[in-house]
């Protein structure tokens, strides 16, 4: 007798595996759930499962699988008018590109994600994306651009932690120097 597992059960299985840090099993279960959710009317849930799989694959060190899992999901969210999840999908793609060493593609995806988050006013998540974008810009050798991006990202945080406050203070120094020169 063949036992059929529901998409909901697959999702729960994936969440349990993720909590146990069994990321590869989690990713595979999320992908299986996505396949089950690929019925008409369930595309958004399928895309969400694929993004969860992408995150799990990244945690497992499977960068190419992470990228493949999330590619195209931003379109599903865009067509559904879900800008926040569209931006998150682009951020997931950017993280996969970054892990693969495709820094130009990572920067472009982070930038688009940041713009979408700004449109909807999600400053907290935008701050995280801007900090990731800054790190990529730095790796690309764009030091000044990285500095400006990091400062813009930190300015968005309403209640910065101690580390963020310190970084903000350090970043103000070069800007105040440049202001004195002009």
Feature roles, as predicted:
Residues 1-182:
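Intrinsically disordered, low-complexity regions
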């Amino acid at each position: 007798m063949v036992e059929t597992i529901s998409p909901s059960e697959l999702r729960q299985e994936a969440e349990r595996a993720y909590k146990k840090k069994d990321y590869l099993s989690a990713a595979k279960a999320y992908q299986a759930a996505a396949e089950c959710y690929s019925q008409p009317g369930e595309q958004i849930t399928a895309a969400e499962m694929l993004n969860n799989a992408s995150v799990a694959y990244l945690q497992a060190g499977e960068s190419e699988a992470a990228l493949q899992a999330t590619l195209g999901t931003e379109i599903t969210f865009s067509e559904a008018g879900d800008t926040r999840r569209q931006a998150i999908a682009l951020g997931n793609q950017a993280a996969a590109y970054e892990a693969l060493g495709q820094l130009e593609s990572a920067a472009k995806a982070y930038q688009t994600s940041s713009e979408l988050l700004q449109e909807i006013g999600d400053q907290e998540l935008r701050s995280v994306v801007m900090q990731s974008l800054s790190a990529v810009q730095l790796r690309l050798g764009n030091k000044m651009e990285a500095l400006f991006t990091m400062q813009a990202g930190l300015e968005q945080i309403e209640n910065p932690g101690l580390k963020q406050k310190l970084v903000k203070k350090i970043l103000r120094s070069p800007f105040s120097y440049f202001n004195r020169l002009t």
